[in-house]
């Protein structure tokens, strides 16, 4: 290989590990601030209305099938650029075709340069997102110049810069292909680290040749972009972690203070889980394992899970004692695992109905020939011993299992187990949803910027809040996130979610004073909470556990809001900002209902400063309460 040792076992694209409610983004136990390494949000988004007004020649493109049409759009918008089709395009349940492209240079990826095209169910171009690099190209291919470091130096550079407890003194480098290697014989990571030679578009408009080093450290699953010439310089870091009969708290009881446990028989939905929750179509289980998830205890916080303890009952009676007063937590581990398994499967089934299917990159072992990549249920670790007072979800690309770690919270006595707080489980699972939808199932690195990462947190809060609405709630209802596990009426967010600007004063420009994803996420979820109630006021509220559809459209406002937000995730560009995500939701409604809710959406966004005149600038966002003329 021309003197370069490169390896076997393809390096997967970014996995997102997102932590639940605790502010601050740092490497677990190592005092390194990952915010300093976040990628800039570089994408542009051309909405349906903008394209009709500014680029009618693009809106009218038609070149046969949806992939061919999308390819032609990229060629016309970015003439002369080289790119490749990412093999994860699909037609969603709303009829929108999603096609994804990655920019290339000298035969190598520019790893943060993406283009996504959305084709409406009418076959016309709906919108597109673009973050292609437009600066000067290197004069020679790096594989010709050989002007880059050994990959082992890159691993050492990452280890030093991020203070990773990886030992590589006896490691060897195994070649995967001309651009990729795997490091064999290291210790300290949960799996063998790997590296891929690729370009990175920098914030200053230049292009850097980098080694993308992947290290799974458990609570952090990192893609570190190390300068290929000076391996002591780390340009950016992506973290994938963000951060029968069942006796359970019935969905969607939020926590043990608001309901009693019940014994539910066969709680699955055969339309969304046709093998039930305890079979994968080939094997039937008598434990908390099935096609969608596998749940177990993980007291030592390790990476192994298949042989970990989980309750087993040949009669399929998962009925175990639990009371919030029980202590220590291990005395009720069976109940904890069962509750976590139940809640995660309920989320799977609901999100499937809303459009998070096999083609869209959902989490299942057996995809039944429905598209996407299988063998990727969610690994659910109850009472995970790797931390306390938190939870996180790791989202690798489609075809690799997601991993949810749920911790014990020590802010009350006795300590509280977050498996029993539905909002925690919904929030974490929603990281998997947003990371698989945004940018396509094969790209899990689209929500690692400050504003895009903040929206990832906000979507988690929004879905958790909307799903937990009570039958008697109206737009005056306020919701606190993380109240029970935190043992605090204020929870762990800046303000309660509320339609009152006195109770919750957050507006779009509030983001100007925040530099942390949970704070920015609270702003985004506060805006979406306005969307929720505007649509409920117009269409009513379905208090059942599943939506009722008419011609593919939820009939009530609660589930319609979830559907539009979910569709918007798939439409928006990789690394979106608030303005682009707003436009994607409006485009989702245009596709789904022909824009029947345009004014309700605009009024909700405008109320909190995301009106027609809102502008994104990472340091000085401009707010607006204006709405389109037809909505005044």
UniProtKB/Swiss-Prot annotation:
It holds the Pfam family Peptidase_M36. It is found in: Secreted. Residues 21-244 form a propeptide. Glycans are attached at residues 284, 591, 620. One of its GO terms (cellular component) is extracellular region. Residues 1-20 form the signal peptide. Zn(2+) binds at residues 427, 431. Secreted metalloproteinase probably acting as a virulence factor. This is Extracellular metalloproteinase 5. It comes from Arthroderma otae (strain ATCC MYA-4605 / CBS 113480) (Microsporum canis).
């Amino acid at each position: 290989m021309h003197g370069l040792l490169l390896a076997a076992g393809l390096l997967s694209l970014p996995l997102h590990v997102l932590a639940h409610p605790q502010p601050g983004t740092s490497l677990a136990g190592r005092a390194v601030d990952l915010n300093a390494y976040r990628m800039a949000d570089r994408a542009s988004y051309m909405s349906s209305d903008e394209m009709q007004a500014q680029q009618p020649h693009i809106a009218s493109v038609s070149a046969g099938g949806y992939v061919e049409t999308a390819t032609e759009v990229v060629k016309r918008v970015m003439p002369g650029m080289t790119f490749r089709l990412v093999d994860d395009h699909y037609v969603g349940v709303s009829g929108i075709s999603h096609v994804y492209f990655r920019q290339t240079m000298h035969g190598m990826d520019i790893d943060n340069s993406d283009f996504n095209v959305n084709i409406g169910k009418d076959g016309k171009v709906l919108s597109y997102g673009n973050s292609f690099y437009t600066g000067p190209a290197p004069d020679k291919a790096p594989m010709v110049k050989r002007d880059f470091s050994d990959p082992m130096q890159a691993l050492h550079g990452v280890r030093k810069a991020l203070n990773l407890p990886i030992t590589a003194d006896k490691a060897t480098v195994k070649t995967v292909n001309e651009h990729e290697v795997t490091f064999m014989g290291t210790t300290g990571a949960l799996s063998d680290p790997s590296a891929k030679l690729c370009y990175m578009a920098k914030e200053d408009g230049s292009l850097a040749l980098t080694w993308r080093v992947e290290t799974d450290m458990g609570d952090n699953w990192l893609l570190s972009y190390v300068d290929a010439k000076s391996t002591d310089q780390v340009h950016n870091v992506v973290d994938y972690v963000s951060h029968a009969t069942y006796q359970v708290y019935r969905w969607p009881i939020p926590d043990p203070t608001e309901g009693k446990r019940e014994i539910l028989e066969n709680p699955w939905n055969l339309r969304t889980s046709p093998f039930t929750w305890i079979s994968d179509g080939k094997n039937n289980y008598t434990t908390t394992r099935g096609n969608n998830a596998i749940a177990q205890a993980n007291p030592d916080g390790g990476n192994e899970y298949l042989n970990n303890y989980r309750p087993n009952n040949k009669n399929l009676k998962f009925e175990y004692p639990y009371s919030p007063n029980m202590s220590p937590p291990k005395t009720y581990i069976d109940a904890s695992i069962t509750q976590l398994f139940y809640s995660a499967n309920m989320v799977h089934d609901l999100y499937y109905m809303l459009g998070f299917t096999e083609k869209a990159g959902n989490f299942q072992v057996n995809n039944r020939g429905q598209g996407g990549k299988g063998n990727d249920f969610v690994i659910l670790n109850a009472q995970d011993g790797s931390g306390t007072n938190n939870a996180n979800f790791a989202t690798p690309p489609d075809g690799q299992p997601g991993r949810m770690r749920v911790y014990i919270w020590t802010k009350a006595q006795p300590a509280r187990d977050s498996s029993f707080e539905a909002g925690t489980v919904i929030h974490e699972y929603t990281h998997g949803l947003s990371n698989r939808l945004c940018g396509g199932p094969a790209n899990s690195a689209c929500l690692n910027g400050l504003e895009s990462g903040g929206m990832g947190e906000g979507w988690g809060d929004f879905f958790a809040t909307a799903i937990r609405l009570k039958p008697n709630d109206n737009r005056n209802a306020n919701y606190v996130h993380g109240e029970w596990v935190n043992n605090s009426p204020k929870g762990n967010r800046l303000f309660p979610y509320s339609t009152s600007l006195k109770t919750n004063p957050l507006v779009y420009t509030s983001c100007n004073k925040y530099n942390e994803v949970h704070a920015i996420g609270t702003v985004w979820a506060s805006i979406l909470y306005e969307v929720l109630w505007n649509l409920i006021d117009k269409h009513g509220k379905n208090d059942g556990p599943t939506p009722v559809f008419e011609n593919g459209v939820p009939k009530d406002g609660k589930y319609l809001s979830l559907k539009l937000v979910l569709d918007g995730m798939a439409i928006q560009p990789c690394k979106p900002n608030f303005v682009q995500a707003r436009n994607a939701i409006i485009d989702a409604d245009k596709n789904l209902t022909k824009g029947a809710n345009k004014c309700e959406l605009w009024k909700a966004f405008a109320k909190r400063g995301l009106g027609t005149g809102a502008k994104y600038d990472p340091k000085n966002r401009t707010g607006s309460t204006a709405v389109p003329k037809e909505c005044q």
